[in-house]
Amino acid sequence: MGKHRRNNSNATRKAVAASAVALGATAAIASPAQAAEVVVPGTGISVDIAGIETTPGLNNVPGIDQWIPSLSSQAAPTAYAAVIDAPAAQAAPAASTGQAIVDAARTKIGSPYGWGATGPNAFDCSGLTSWAYSQVGKSIPRTSQAQAAQGTPVAYSDLQAGDIVAFYSGATHVGIYSGHGTVIHALNSSTPLSEHSLDYMPFHSAVRF
């Protein structure tokens, strides 16, 4: 009976040793590097196996530090949940100065025309343009002819929102170009402040301040 136990013990040790050698062979093929001691638990068997510490996924094997004592001194890998940061919301671009002028003028659409009026409740043509520009901190000449003469000339094809457009011979009327071929202006006492096509009146010139 005792002899039978010895035989079983010898067989177990041989099987364990074979497992260790097989593990070592796998590691050696995967990554030839510095040798680490591999101990077969419950036996006196230990072998040095090159590269075993770098075997992919080795640290995830339960109880592996009993086989490879050097792994017990290494920090266990930390599992991180995959986190995908949502893209930060893009801030809306700040309105250009020209667009801010248009926006100010547009708030007065429907206001009555008043000769010599500069707002905020009634306007004449150059009174509207002067008032709208003042809302963005810009001071421009008061009369339509002075505005047309003192700004930087702009070609019809290069008009941008906020430019001042003059109409009729002698630039006797002005309005604010609002984009897309339209102008906001205070036309006359029979027409409240409105937005019309540039073709509504004969074009004279355009300027930018």
UniProtKB/Swiss-Prot annotation:
Residues 1-35 form the signal peptide. One of its GO terms (biological process) is proteolysis. It comes from Corynebacterium glutamicum (strain ATCC 13032 / DSM 20300 / JCM 1318 / BCRC 11384 / CCUG 27702 / LMG 3730 / NBRC 12168 / NCIMB 10025 / NRRL B-2784 / 534). SUPFAM superfamilies: Cysteine proteinases. Coiled coil: none annotated. Its EC number is 3.4.-.-. The active site is at 125 (nucleophile), 173 (proton acceptor), 185. The keyword Transcription does not apply. GO terms for molecular function: cysteine-type peptidase activity. It is found in: Secreted. Keywords: Hydrolase, Protease, Secreted, Signal, Thiol protease. Belongs to the peptidase C40 family. The lineage of its organism: Bacteria, Bacillati, Actinomycetota, Actinomycetes, Mycobacteriales. GO terms for cellular component: extracellular region. Residues 95-209 form the NlpC/P60 domain. It is an enzyme of class 3 (hydrolase). The keyword DNA-binding does not apply. Pfam families: NLPC_P60. This is Probable endopeptidase Cgl2188.
